[in-house]
Structures are given as C-alpha cells and as structure tokens.
Regions:
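Short proline/glycine-enriched turn/loop segments at secondary-structure junctions
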Residues: 255-259, 286-293
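Acyl/amide activation-and-transfer machinery of modular secondary-metabolite enzymes
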Residues: 93-99
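Acidic interhelical loop/turn segments
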Residues: 1-24, 210
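Functional-site microenvironments in short loops/helix caps that host divalent-cation chemistry
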Residues: 23, 29, 33, 37-59, ...
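Acidic-aromatic/histidine active-site loop/patch
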Residues: 109
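Short, structured beta-strand segments at or near domain termini in extracellular proteins/domains
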Residues: 294-305
C-alpha cells in the first residue's frame, strides 16, 4: 500500500483516493459488525461470558416523557449533497413529497415494549404482518433477542455480560417485524426513511456512539426536541431498501458494493452504540432483512399530522 501511494501519479490518484475512502469506511463497518457478531457468539455460551468486564455502566436515568415533534409536508430534498465521502446508495440527491407528520421525541423504551408483551403482543396475530407472524411461530419468539426471564425478573445479555433489564433504556435487538407489530398495537406507525432524514437534518452527530464506552444503549437524557437520533440503536423505518431515482451502480467491483443488495431488505437510520461517530450522517442508509435482530436495532414511532 505504501508503495502504491508513493508511486501513484496524478492521472491515477483520483481513482486511488476513491478506493482508499471506500476501504477505510468499509473497515469501520466491519469493526461494528465484529462487535455484533461477538455479542451473538458469546450469548450462545452457557457461561454467558463478558466481552469486556470494564465497560462503563449506562447512567441510571429516567427516560423523559415522550412527546411529538411536528414536521411540515411538501416537497423535500433527501440524499447526500456534501463533498465529503458517502456511499453510492445515499445518492443521487432527489426530491420527494411528504405529507405533514409527527415524530416521537425518543425511541421506544424497554418498559414500553414490556407493556406490549404483557398485552399478548407475541400471541396476537392481529398485530403482525403475515410474514412476521409466520416468523414468530416458526422461531418461537416471545421476547426480544438476548432477553431472559429469571425468577420473575427480566435480564438481558450485553457485551459486559448479563444485566438486569433497565426499563428506561431504548428497546434493542428487535426485528422490523417486531417494530411494526408494536407500532400497530400502539396505534401509530414507523417513520419512512425520508421522514427520518428530514427530521435529522441539521442535528449534530452526537450521542451514545462507540466512543462513549458503553457499547450498550442508554436512557435518553432530558432535553427539548428530538433525542437520540444518533447512536444508541439503529432505528427501523417503514421503507424498503431500494435505489434512489437515478441511481446507477459504478462499473466493476465497486458497483457491487450496495446495488446488488437492494432487494427484500428494510432501511435503518441513525447509527448505534457501536457505530463510530465519524462514520454516521443524516443520509446514511443501513439495511437488514426484516427478520434479523442481532444488530443493535430499535425504533421510534411516527404518525400523520
């Protein structure tokens, strides 16, 4: 690599620089995925070992009362527009029409999700999409991934080992199917990815990201406006992972980076507690299959205004 950088002439430097940027950002993605894989693998060990016993405990705070932030409808532009790096799936920038909507001030908490469970959430097909209900029955889901009921108390497995469930923390490790079922139960819906991006625009990229040292979602701190838009949990949206209007994959191997995955997956936004702060942005599109829940993923609610 050093030889390549030293010998790269002006005529090839733009192509070299492009590939280096993609490589660095791809490495950040793998650093995040390594943590999610480590957690999944350790959770299958009967001894429930900790990845790190020195992780900071999340603050024992009470999540602020949920309120609703109103956003106007109309024609909005979404997608990446700056000169800094972005993946091809964030482009091209384009216009989209939105009706007025309201977005919850924070993600749904563990305690709020427990109310859904107590009301028979995992046993009522009326809350679930057909494929979601089939998944619940086939995989015998009755709670989020890593939750375990021990002597009448809920525990969850973390990268720091097993911990008692903190009801104030954002719900985590739930699939799109579970998020959609909760929203139906609550009489709300999930935001579209365009709604999420419009809401996040102008907010600083700050929060409980990997550098916080928790490697676990934390309860929201008191504040006005939207909270926890970045970090803590990747937020499910109602949007399927599709190419933006005018998207064209690059030629060669670089064109396979995102385009070939634009099928049967759902978009998540905002990063998580294991995402690098300099890796995330308002236009960033993550994507997973609707049944997957090993990633640090949660959700917030939306409704029509």
């Amino acid at each position: 690599m050093l030889t390549l950088l030293h010998n790269a002439g002006e005529e090839v430097w733009p192509a070299v620089q492009q590939r280096l940027e993609i490589g660095f950002n791809h490495e950040q993605q793998h650093q995040e995925l390594l943590l999610t894989d480590i957690k999944l693998n350790l959770s299958t060990n009967p001894l429930r070992p900790a990845y790190r016993s020195d992780l900071h405990q999340t603050p024992k705070a009470s999540a602020p009362h949920q309120h609703w932030i109103v956003f106007p409808g109309g024609v909005h532009e979404i997608g990446h527009q700056d000169d800094c790096f972005a993946y091809d799936n964030e482009k091209p920038r384009h216009r989209t029409y939105l009706n007025p909507f309201r977005l919850a001030s924070r993600p749904v908490t563990n305690g709020e999700y427990l109310a859904f469970m107590a009301d028979g959430g995992y046993g009522n097909p009326g809350f679930w999409l057909s494929d979601g209900w089939s998944t619940v029955k086939r995989l015998h889901w009755s709670s989020p991934l890593y939750w375990e009921l021990i002597e009448g108390e809920w525990w969850q497995f973390t990268l720091g080992g097993p911990r008692k469930l903190n009801l104030e923390e954002p719900i985590c490790h739930v699939s799109y199917y579970e998020a959609e079922a909760y929203a139906t139960w609550a009489g709300k819906r999930l935001p579209t990815e365009a709604e999420w991006e419009i809401a996040a625009r102008g907010l600083p990229v700050a929060g409980n990201l990997r550098d916080s040292g928790y490697l676990h979602p934390a309860a929201a701190m008191p504040g006005d406006g939207l909270l926890q838009m970045y970090g803590d949990v990747w937020e499910h949206t109602a949007s399927p992972y599709q190419p933006y209007p005018g998207f064209r994959p690059a030629a060669g191997a670089l064109g396979e980076y995102n385009g070939k995955f634009m099928c049967s997956q759902m978009v998540l936004r905002g990063g998580s507690c294991v995402t690098a702060a300099d890796h995330i942005r308002a236009s960033y599109r993550n994507f997973f299959y609707p049944h997957e829940r090993w990633q640090f993923q949660g959700f917030r609610l939306a409704e029509d205004a």
